[in-house]
């Protein structure tokens, strides 16, 4: 099911991994994560898992040190409801790096982000978790967070045992 769409997206990834020097590949699955009709979510998880497996295979074919990183909703329940199954991906060893972000709100600072679902999920495996460090707060007074808020967000992630930090959605702060 949905073979044509899968193959089209996979072809782009395969070209990027085989024709260009790359350290790996990152999938952004958190922006509008609506991949399947609500009646097809269960079947969709299996479809997406098979596709993620194909992507992982092409990434590793270009070097065992190459990694597949996936940005996805920060709650596993939200992933499951979108047709994404990180629990199975960890069991199958097909995702190297998980980057949990607030569901559909990945640009906003989330000082109280909870990474425990993912750090517990990957414990004892080869998969890793990166905490996201964002800059946007979009209030009526401020667009971007002050440095103290950004540092608090980073320290919260580190205190929870993430394996590293991922600077996400800093478009307006060039040169960062």
Regions found by a protein language model. Name each.
Residues 1-176:
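Glycan-processing catalytic domains of CAZymes
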